Amino acid sequence: VFKGSTKHPNIPQELSSHGARPNGTTWYDRTNYYETFSASEENLKWALSLESDRMINSFIAKKDLETEFSVVRNEFERGENDPGGVLNERIMSTAYWWHNYGKSTIGSKEDIEKVPIENLQAFYKKYYQPDNAVLTVAGKVDEEKTIALVNEYFGPIPKPSRELQHPYTAEPVQDGERSVELRRVGDV
């Protein structure tokens, strides 16, 4: 979603020209994308236009995978070299046998290197929709104008025809002691 969308084909250039600082993070229950920028009506309109368009019209292209995968691989390797992070991952996988909280949010190295572009595109189309999102606007803004702009940019997006299923897997009762021991070479 950082590469481009139908109305915003060069997102990195636009972010730079607006003096915006973007980022995104993923955790167990959410992914978030954001940008910070100087408070102005022009910047707010631009940001809402950008976010509404990339929510449903992002270029998720095979040609961009290799550069993105190198970024994700680096994040993966940084995590593998963080003893506290590795320990937390092992604790979660011990506590949650079936629930997704027991799985790493970044996935395995094989997931990162071998995921088909079609899977990423299908995930994006299924989950990146207004009915599955929260929009937060903070800063020096006029509340009424901001709500009107949100309606202007996000209102025309049609409600998706798909229905999101709630997870049906139930985590079994933790009926006994569980422990984790992690041993690795290195310094903390």
What is the predicted function of each stretch?
Residues 3-5, 36-68:
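M16/insulysin-pitrilysin zinc metalloprotease superfamily fold
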Residues 7-43, 78-132, 156-188:
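Non-catalytic beta-strand/loop surface segments
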Residues 18, 54-57, 152-157:
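Conserved short hydrophobic interaction patches
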Residues 47-53, 147-154:
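Short amphipathic alpha-helices in soluble, non-transmembrane regions
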Residues 41, 57, 61, 143-144, ...:
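Short beta-strands and strand-coil junctions in structured, solvent-facing domains, enriched
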Residues 8, 12, 48, 66-69, ...:
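Hydrophobic face of alpha-helices
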